[in-house]
Regions:
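Positively charged n-region of N-terminal signal peptides that target proteins for export
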Residues: 1-4
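Long, low-hydrophobicity ectodomains and other hydrophilic envelope-associated domains
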Residues: 28-187
């Protein structure tokens, strides 16, 4: 009888743990505003929606490191583009949706810093910037507090690095970042 009661408590504990971890794995949705250069002498405020379905795991980054070192850059880019961590969606961007291929959440004193990585793409239909082949990625940086509010930056032309700590970091950037403000966790 004691074994049944103990096993029942163990199953209840496991079920509670799994349900709480499932709640932690729910998608996060952020909204933000960005000042975007439009036609000459004008600037528009655009709203952006960012949905993060999951964050990059150590195993995924380790796999990318292995592919890069053993099979080369093109295979690395294929493996990188195969990862789907969420969507960067400019509202009113004429149907443009950019898939996020890498995502990290780094705890800070007041909240966390979220880094999102994708291959370089034009997300603003009104802009056609010059590109540099050395900076083939786009990085979105969100700095949010415990309540999910904060600021951020979009680095449209960035280079990335895979670290031995199994993370992806921005190595440098070519053009000045666009400032995000009114960043809010909406879901």
């Amino acid at each position: 009888m004691k074994q049944r009661i103990i096993s029942c408590f163990v199953w209840i504990f496991v079920a509670a743990f799994l349900s709480s971890s499932a709640a932690l794995l729910e998608a996060e949705e952020f909204t933000a505003r960005v000042l975007s250069g439009g036609m000459q002498y004008t600037e528009n405020v655009k709203k952006i929606k960012i949905t993060i379905d999951s964050y990059s795991t150590d195993e995924e980054v380790l796999n990318l490191i292995g592919v890069m070192s053993q099979q080369g850059y093109q295979r690395f880019m294929d493996a990188f583009r195969a990862l789907n961590k969420g969507i960067f969606f400019p509202i009113g961007g004429r149907g443009i949706k950019i898939i996020i291929h890498g995502a990290h959440s780094i705890p800070t004193e007041n909240g966390r810093q979220i880094l999102l990585f994708t291959s370089r793409q034009s997300w603003d239909v009104e802009m056609n910037p010059r590109t540099d082949p050395r900076f083939g990625f786009m990085v979105v940086e969100l700095n949010v507090d415990d309540k999910g509010k904060g600021t951020g930056k979009i680095y449209e032309q960035a280079s990335i690095q895979l670290t031995p700590q199994r993370t992806i970091v921005m190595d440098g950037y070519n053009s000045p970042p666009k400032q995000l403000w009114d960043v809010r966790l909406s879901k």
